[in-house]
C-alpha cells in the first residue's frame, strides 16, 4: 500500500522551515503532495500560481514530492487525491491548540484522515512566512531563512509594490 501524505499550507512564501518539513515528510511517506492553499482571506503577497511555481523549484530535488494548488476544503482535497495522511508542523505549544481543532474538524469531515505532527529542526523553529515578510519590508536580512530563489522573488515582489 502506498503511503500518500499531504502537507498543506499557504506557503506565502515558502521558508526553510517548510522545506525542512517537506524534506523529512518525503523520507517518511511514499508520495507527498505539497498542497498550496489559495487562502484569499489571508491576502497572500504571492499569487497561487507564483507560490506553486516557487515551491516546485524549491522541491524539484525531491522525487516523491508533487506541488499542487487547491481552493477547496482540505478534507475534500485529500479525498480527491486518495490521501489519508496530513502532515502539519508545530513550532510552539501555541500552534498545538489550533492544529488540534483543525485535525478534529478534518477527521469529522473525513474519518480516515489522520494528522501527523512534525516539529521543525531547532534552527527553523521560530520562522514563519509572516515574520520573514515583515523583516524583509523593513530591510532586514532574510536570506538565512528562505531558499535563494524565494529570497529573490520576495525582494522583487516587495520592490514592485
Swiss-Prot record:
GO terms for biological process: coenzyme A biosynthetic process. Disulfide bonds: none annotated. GO terms for molecular function: ATP binding; pantetheine-phosphate adenylyltransferase activity. CDD domains: PPAT. InterPro entries: Cyt_trans-like (IPR004821), PPAT (IPR001980), Rossmann-like_a/b/a_fold (IPR014729). Belongs to the bacterial CoaD family. This is Phosphopantetheine adenylyltransferase. It comes from Serratia proteamaculans (strain 568).
Amino acid at each position: 500500500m502506498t503511503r500518500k501524505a499531504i502537507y498543506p499550507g499557504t506557503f506565502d512564501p515558502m521558508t526553510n522551515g517548510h522545506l525542512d518539513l517537506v524534506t523529512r515528510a518525503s523520507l517518511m511517506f511514499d508520495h507527498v503532495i505539497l498542497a498550496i492553499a489559495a487562502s484569499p482571506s489571508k491576502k497572500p503577497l504571492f499569487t497561487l500560481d507564483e507560490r506553486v511555481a516557487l515551491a516546485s523549484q524549491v522541491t524539484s530535488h525531491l522525487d516523491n514530492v508533487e506541488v499542487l494548488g487547491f481552493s477547496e476544503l482540505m478534507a475534500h482535497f485529500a479525498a480527491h487525491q486518495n490521501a489519508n495522511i496530513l502532515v502539519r508542523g508545530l513550532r510552539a505549544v501555541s500552534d498545538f491548540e489550533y492544529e488540534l481543532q483543525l485535525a478534529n474538524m478534518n477527521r469529522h469531515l473525513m474519518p480516515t484522515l489522520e494528522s501527523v505532527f512534525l516539529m521543525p529542526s531547532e534552527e527553523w523553529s521560530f520562522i514563519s512566512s509572516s515574520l520573514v515578510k515583515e523583516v524583509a519590508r523593513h530591510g532586514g536580512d532574510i536570506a538565512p531563512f528562505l531558499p535563494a530563489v524565494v529570497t529573490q522573488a520576495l525582494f522583487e515582489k516587495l520592490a514592485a509594490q
